[in-house]
Design a protein with these regions (language model features):
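Active-site and substrate-binding clefts of carbohydrate-active enzymes
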Residues: 2-55, 87, 194-204, 208-211, ...
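Phosphate/oxyanion-binding active-site loops and adjacent basic polyanion-contact surfaces
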Residues: 52-60, 127-138, 217, 225-232, ...
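Generic structural signal for well-ordered alpha-helices
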Residues: 61-65, 100-104, 135-145, 168, ...
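Alpha-helical scaffolding within the catalytic cores
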Residues: 63, 94-107, 188-201, 231-239
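Metal-dependent polysaccharide deacetylase catalytic core of the NodB/CE4 family, i.e.
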Residues: 76, 80-160, 202-221, 245, ...
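Catalytic domains of cell-wall/extracellular-matrix polysaccharide-remodeling enzymes
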Residues: 136-193, 256-273
Length: 534
């Protein structure tokens, strides 16, 4: 018996406003509430959603619901699964509430499973080692699906099927039982994707997308140059029947059915006839991802190191669709570096805008790959060229960064900003003397204080005489007061333990002072909230 697991990814990004700069100049004074309309091209976004709904979403939902109803009283039911991004649902709420209702009808059928995923279709799983932002976005998505469909997802998929061992550990730590990723040869070697595996050193079940059979439907279906064209449901079902193993995972973009392949291609008829053609084969059964994970014990482990992260994108099937060329890398790193600052503001509007800019689509448009992958990148790019995509994104990200910094300059946030952890490249590296690094680099005042306790006094003397500590505190950390205090200490010409002791006392006093300010702000904020509720 072979399970057939059919899954759909449903996503539309908020595309950026190419005229952002001119629109900004025309408006003059801009408030935070104006930024969502300024940063994104909602006329274009609405147009794309409405067009895709007409050609794809409504017809496909209708077909799937009809086929579920057709087989729901039979032994071999038709079942599917959806991964729907949070930003897609937001667009439905804005411009197509009827479409959202049709997804709710599917949820009520009892034959549809919903997967969790990062709310903003982001690359947050690649941000640092603790993956705090990744976890927060999945939790936001989980709450959305629960509220909207009264459904508790048990299986999670990452954006574009990005996967490695560390990501899997995070998913397991959140309580998920299974995930899905690409069945890449370099991790499978001689093994087949048509089995259930588990993550390395984990109990998380891993379902692997059969990309050959998935892409027959998702990419090659309407290609008249393909030797198997035209593809009908009967032929495709026979290919599924010939596949050995526990399960065949078919995972495609939902836009396959009417948007990527237009209705004239026969894709809707293919979808309509597929359940029945599969059910003609006695050993084929439709299953949801959680059913597959429960039915089959894993036959082995999938081992994917972080340096070998996989995805379902392009021929490389790695993160290079988004992080490859200098334009993509600069934007990705700049976006990541804003996390501490934007969250330090505590401003929900700014945090939400920063998260919208995390949508992987923005970096995808900057790809300069050639060949087949390049054609796909160009097809989806609303900016016309990778350079234009880079220019528009950079302008908007820079504008957001400037507004975040202005927010952080407010007195109540200044202390929090000084205590923040600095991004890579902004830390202080201790040297013993010129060209003799100690190997110690700190990224916050508290790390600086802790390192001063143990670093050799020759390093402290080297930096205090050159004014390095003061410059870093003033120009990078932004603590002018502390910088001035260290300048005064350097004038005293202290040496050895006496110098270390004076620096530590000054640092300890300043850190306590800053923490007291932030704690006082927190107390006042809580007090104001209590007043509002009484």
């Amino acid at each position: 018996m072979t399970d057939i697991c059919l899954m759909f990814e449903v996503h539309q990004p908020f595309r950026l406003n190419r005229k952002f700069h001119s629109d900004l100049m025309a408006l003059g004074k801009v408030t935070k509430k104006d930024l969502f309309s300024l940063y994104f091209d909602h006329k274009l976004n609405r147009h794309v959603l409405v067009r895709a709904a007409e050609k794809c979403y409504f017809p496909a939902n209708s077909i799937i619901l009809e086929q579920i109803d057709r087989y729901k009283r039979e032994q071999k039911k038709f079942k599917v699964a959806y991964g729907i991004s949070g930003v897609f649902i937001e667009q439905c709420e804005r411009w197509s509430p009827d479409l959202l209702e049709s997804f709710k009808q599917l949820s009520e059928s009892g034959c549809v499973e919903f997967l969790d995923e990062p709310y903003y279709h982001s690359l947050a799983s690649l941000h640092g080692t603790d993956r705090t932002e990744f976890v927060e976005q999945i939790e936001l998505h989980h709450q959305l699906i629960r509220d909207l469909f009264n459904y508790e997802p048990r299986v999670v998929e990452n954006t574009e099927c990005l996967y490695n061992n560390a990501i899997a550990k995070t998913m397991e730590g959140m309580g998920y039982k299974a995930t899905v990723t690409e069945g890449v040869e370099r991790i499978l070697r001689w093994r087949s994707p048509n089995y259930v595996y588990k993550a390395k050193d984990s109990n998380l079940r891993v379902l692997l997308r059969n990309y050959s059979l998935s892409d027959d439907m998702g990419f090659r279906f309407s290609s008249t140059l393909w030797e198997e064209w035209p593809l009908n449901a009967s032929k495709y079902a026979s290919w599924l029947a010939a596949a050995s193993g526990q399960v065949v995972v078919l995972f495609v973009d939902y836009e396959t059915f009417g948007e990527h392949h237009w209705p004239e291609s026969g894709i809707h008829e293919f979808l309509e006839w597929l359940p029945g053609e599969v059910n003609k084969w006695d050993h084929l059964w439709w299953r949801t991802p959680s059913e597959v994970a429960c039915r089959h014990a894993p036959i082995g482990e999938i081992d994917v190191h972080e340096y070998n992260t996989i995805s379902w994108a392009d021929l490389e099937r790695d993160p290079s669709a988004w992080i490859n060329n200098p334009m993509q890398t600069v934007c990705y790193e700049s976006l990541k570096e804003l996390e501490k600052s934007v969250k330090g503001t505590g401003d929900e509007d700014l945090i939400r805008l920063w998260r919208y800019l995390q949508m992987s689509d923005n970096l995808y448009y900057m790809s300069i790959k050639g060949g087949g992958p390049g054609d796909v990148h160009s097809y989806f790019n609303p900016m016309g060229s990778p350079v234009e995509a880079f220019a528009v994104y950079s302008r908007i990200l820079s504008d957001l960064e400037a507004r975040i910094l202005v927010e952080l300059e407010k007195p109540e946030l200044t202390a929090k900003r000084m205590l923040r952890r600095l991004p890579i490249g902004k830390g202080f590296t201790f040297f013993y003397e010129f060209a003799r690094p100690s190997g110690l680099t700190v990224h916050s005042l508290e790390e600086f204080y802790a390192t001063l306790k143990t670093v050799d006094t020759s390093s402290i003397r080297f930096h205090i005489e050159k004014g390095d500590f003061e410059r870093w505190l003033r120009q990078v950390v932004g603590d002018i007061k502390l910088s001035n205090e260290l300048t005064n200490i350097s004038k005293k010409r202290l040496r050895g333990k006496a110098l270390r002791k004076r620096l530590l006392a000054t640092m300890e006093r300043r850190i306590k002072e800053l923490k007291g300010i932030t704690e006082g702000t927190s107390v006042r904020t809580k007090h104001r909230r209590r007043l509002k509720t009484t």
